[in-house]
């Protein structure tokens, strides 16, 4: 078997901690990805799908009423306008094309909020691939609109009842399935985490977010933003925004983890700042674990951020200080969800609302002219019933 072509680590984080049976499949995937990145026909087809199917470039919207500070402009990178309703569509189209290139006939995926599942289902429908999606039973219950969308597009949705019945358990089941079917199936991982080469593949297929943002900012403002802000669960929307700005030292990179019921409670999903390094989901990364090293259940109001670990490149950016990671509570995200709807007529995903919440807080504290860009990673249609139940009939 050939040597790895890409560095599997980001500093001390990352790697390929998987059963031996999966190593050939991961090496095959890495080789196919490297070859595809050098193939002009592959890149042209991917670019065409992003433009003429998914609807790129997405808008960069200057908010009119959201900023609490006249010195601060808050822009939104509108991934909510992408076909499928979230940033997930970008990298799913890339991986699905890669799977076809490798001769795979079936796609296995996991999903939390259902957005990755929907994106996978639409890509499989488009490209004629069989689709199987693992989803925690709790998430199936709280994300019923997305479950219906997946099934409507021909996907088989498999509820996972083991463990906490959420995203981490869906990930485990999907990986287990792939262990026995990798010769015919591709595991289409939904975030910039997991074993090498997934964190790199997902970043490269998502980096269009930051590339477009940089170009649009230079056109609109004649300069780069002071900070780009994105929510962080596994971290794909954030790494997509950050990737093209990492080498721009004037631009602050800010990730926002879910503080849930409070960082000082067990009910959160913020392993970057409040976890310990461990091995999970095929990678070495910060992980929520107890004193005995067992994985603790993460918690967030938003299913897509309800994950006990985080992508290895985010761990490295945090360790080196290149990016800063903050957090927002359920209550802060709920307030931001309503605030954006009221102020701008845009209903964000609860995941994205965490980033909005931090941006508004940051804007309030700025003492000079500042430009912030928030990655509005998805739309909030999927969350309206959850939010309605929580507000319990209160006037929104």
From Swiss-Prot:
Its cofactor is pyridoxal 5'-phosphate. NCBIfam families: trpB. This is Tryptophan synthase beta chain. Tetramer of two alpha and two beta chains. Transmembrane segments: none annotated. The gene is trpB. Coiled coil: none annotated. The keyword Ion transport does not apply. InterPro entries: Trp_synth_b_CS, Trp_synth_beta, Trp_synth_beta/beta-like, TrpB-like_PALP, TrpB-like_PALP_sf. Belongs to the TrpB family. It catalyses: (1S,2R)-1-C-(indol-3-yl)glycerol 3-phosphate + L-serine = D-glyceraldehyde 3-phosphate + L-tryptophan + H2O. Pathway: Amino-acid biosynthesis; L-tryptophan biosynthesis; L-tryptophan from chorismate: step 5/5. It holds the Pfam family PALP. One of its GO terms (molecular function) is tryptophan synthase activity. The beta subunit is responsible for the synthesis of L-tryptophan from indole and L-serine. The keyword Iron-sulfur does not apply. Keywords: Amino-acid biosynthesis, Aromatic amino acid biosynthesis, Lyase, Pyridoxal phosphate, Tryptophan biosynthesis. SUPFAM superfamilies: Tryptophan synthase beta subunit-like PLP-dependent enzymes. The modification N6-(pyridoxal phosphate)lysine is found at residue 88. It comes from Shewanella baltica (strain OS155 / ATCC BAA-1091).
């Amino acid at each position: 078997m050939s040597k790895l072509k890409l560095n599997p680590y980001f500093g001390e984080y990352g790697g390929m901690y998987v059963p031996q049976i999966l190593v050939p499949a991961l090496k095959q995937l890495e080789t196919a990805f490297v070859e595809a990145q050098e193939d002009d026909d592959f890149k042209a087809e991917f670019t065409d799908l992003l433009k003429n199917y998914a609807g790129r470039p997405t808008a960069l919207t200057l908010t009119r009423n959201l900023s609490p500070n006249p010195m601060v402009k808050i822009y939104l990178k509108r991934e909510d306008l992408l076909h499928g309703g979230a940033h997930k569509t970008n990298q799913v189209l890339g991986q699905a094309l890669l799977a076809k290139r490798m001769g795979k006939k079936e796609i296995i995926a996991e999903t939390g909020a259902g957005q990755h599942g929907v994106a996978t289902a639409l890509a499989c429908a488009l490209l004629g691939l069989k689709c199987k999606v693992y989803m925690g039973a709790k998430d199936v219950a709280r994300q019923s609109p997305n479950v219906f969308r997946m099934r409507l597009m021909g996907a088989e949705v498999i509820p996972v009842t083991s463990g906490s019945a959420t995203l981490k358990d869906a990930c485990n089941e999907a990986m287990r399935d792939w262990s026995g079917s990798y010769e015919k199936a591709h595991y289409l991982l939904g975030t910039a985490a997991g074993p090498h080469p997934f964190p790199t593949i997902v970043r490269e297929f998502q980096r269009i977010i930051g590339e477009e943002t940089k170009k649009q900012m230079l056109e609109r403002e004649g300069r780069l933003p002071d900070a780009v802000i994105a929510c962080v669960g596994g971290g794909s929307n954030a790494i997509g925004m950050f990737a093209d700005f990492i080498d721009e030292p004037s631009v602050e990179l800010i990730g926002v983890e879910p503080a849930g019921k409070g960082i000082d409670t067990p009910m959160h999903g913020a392993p970057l700042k409040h976890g310990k390094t461990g091995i999970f989901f095929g990678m070495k990364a910060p992980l929520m674990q107890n004193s005995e090293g067992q994985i603790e259940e993460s918690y967030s109001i938003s299913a897509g951020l309800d994950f006990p670990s985080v992508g290895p490149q985010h761990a490295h950016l945090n360790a080196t200080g290149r990016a800063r990671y903050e957090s927002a509570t359920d209550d802060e995200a709920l307030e931001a969800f309503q605030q954006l709807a009221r102020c701008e007529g845009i209903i964000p995903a609860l995941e994205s609302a965490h980033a909005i919440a931090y941006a508004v807080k940051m804007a309030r504290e700025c003492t000079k002219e500042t430009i912030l860009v928030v990655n509005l990673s998805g739309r909030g249609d999927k969350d309206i019933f959850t939010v309605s139940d929580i507000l319990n009939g209160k006037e929104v």
